[in-house]
UniProtKB/Swiss-Prot annotation:
PANTHER family linked: GLYCOSYLTRANSFERASE WBBK-RELATED
Coiled-coil boundaries: none
Functional pH dependence: Optimum pH is 8.5.
Descriptive protein name: MMP alpha-(1->4)-mannosyltransferase
Source taxonomy: Bacteria, Bacillati, Actinomycetota, Actinomycetes, Mycobacteriales
Consequence of substituting E321A: Loss of activity
Length: 411
């Protein structure tokens, strides 16, 4: 099968979407399929040699180290470039739409090259153009971004709320496009339920295929650091619940030596950075970002507890990576987290989202119980190996491709 895999951002440091592209494309190639990734910036790294990469460049207005840069007039070459610039200048996020339009232009010249096109969370209007060209189309919706919008609007000060709503303006487009794609993949039953509610798609459109984990890379190791907690957040946003964990860590340090390894890129002088200083825990909170896979795996395996305090997750790759590492988890009872980690007390302890008292108490009890830490860690490793396989993800995804191909052939 010849597969075009579209992703408007694909670097693994940008979050789970990049991890998904890299591992899914590799396992599809392992099954004998021909895979070509079409990506906007930042481009993927570490793709399997059998997987081709076609770059779909944008103006890249969020690139480091000069985000929100002003492009040179000579860079504005098409109406799509102009739309990207104007949307950014008016506080919107253009990438899902503008990437999809550029991808449609590229694929228009390659109509005979692919059996199926698979979109990764873009859900831009360009996908409808791709479908009209006759390509069988599948899209992955990791979770409905309506949930991110809801949390961020609630957390924003009154004067920022309109700006947050404007930033998330692309969500209404994603709703409209999703309703017109017959085959949608998502990564958990919880996410599927939320997509049904928020996007008003039909149940027949949705196929649940949980994500996988590399259990050879993420595995238990010797030398865990006493009282070390690790948390991984793909973005410095209220949805990840990091502020609640920081308050818990500040309380824990009163009674014990404790250390937090926070893997995220903090907004300079942003709310999280300020909170760390206000709580007086700068000496025990160590932040890092841009880690290699090997560095992340080593750090996860060095901690006694992994904490996932999110207010919502459509899946949570850090959860399955922690389980594969044999690292016990304390996670919020939110979104798909209970579905991913299993019943409370099996591989993880579940707590009420945003409840600092409960989070502090559960973390403290776990850190005081080496036997419970070992039991949860062993169970987590077993669950990761038995349940979360990228090979299975690829095989189930191919089955959905076949449905999309058959649907188009029948028309």
């Amino acid at each position: 099968m010849r597969i075009a895999l579209l992703s408007y951002r694909s670097k693994t440091h940008c979050g789970g979407q990049g991890v998904y592209v890299r591992h899914l494309s590799r396992e599809l190639a392992e099954l004998g399929h021909d895979v070509e990734v079409f990506s906007g910036q930042p481009y993927p790294e570490g793709l399997d040699p059998r997987v081709r990469l076609t770059k779909v460049p944008s103006l890249d207005l969020y690139r480091e180290p000069d985000p929100f840069r002003i492009p040179r007039p000579s860079e504005i070459k098409t109406s799509i470039d102009l739309e990207e610039l104007l949307t950014t200048w008016t506080a919107g996020f253009p990438e899902p739409k503008t990437f999809s339009l550029r991808a449609a232009r590229v694929l228009a010249g390659r109509r005979g090259d692919f059996d199926v096109v698979h979109d990764n969370q873009c859900l831009g209007t360009g996908l409808l153009q791709i479908a009209k060209m006759g390509f069988p189309l599948v899209a992955t919706v990791h979770h409905p971004i309506t949930r991110d919008r809801e949390v961020e609007v609630a957390a924003a000060r009154w004067w920022r709320k309109p700006l947050v709503r404007r930033w998330y303006g692309f969500v209404e487009m994603q709703k409209r496009v999703a309703r017109q794609i017959p085959e949608l993949l998502t990564v958990s039953s919880a996410s599927a339920s939320d997509i049904l509610t928020d996007f008003a798609v039909s149940p027949e459109q949705l196929h649940v295929v949980p994500l996988g984990v590399d259990t050879k890379l993420f595995q238990p190791r010797e030398g865990r650091v006493r009282n070390r907690i690790i948390a991984i957040a793909s973005a410095d946003v209220p949805l990840k619940g990091v502020s609640h964990l920081l308050h818990a860590v500040a309380r824990l340090r009163v009674e014990r030596d404790v250390e937090l390894q926070l893997v995220t890129k903090l907004e300079p002088n942003g709310p999280t950075e300020k909170l760390i200083a206000e709580l007086g825990i700068s000496d025990i909170v160590h932040t890092s970002s841009g880690l290699s896979d090997e560095e992340l795996a080593a750090l996860l395996a060095s901690a006694e507890v992994a904490c996932i305090p999110s207010l919502y997750e459509g899946f949570s790759l850090p959860a399955v990576e922690a389980m594969a590492s044999g690292t016990p988890i304390v996670a919020s009872r939110a979104g798909a987290l209970p579905e991913v980690v299993g019943p409370d007390g099996e591989c993880a302890r579940l707590v009420t989202p945003a409840d600092v008292d409960e989070l502090t108490a559960v973390l403290g009890r776990l850190l005081d119980s080496p036997r419970e830490l070992r039991r949860l860690g062993d169970n987590g490793r077993r669950r990761a190996v038995e349940v979360f396989s990228w090979q299975s993800v690829a095989a189930q995804t191919v089955a959905v491709y076949e449905k999309a191909i058959a649907r188009v052939a029948a028309c």
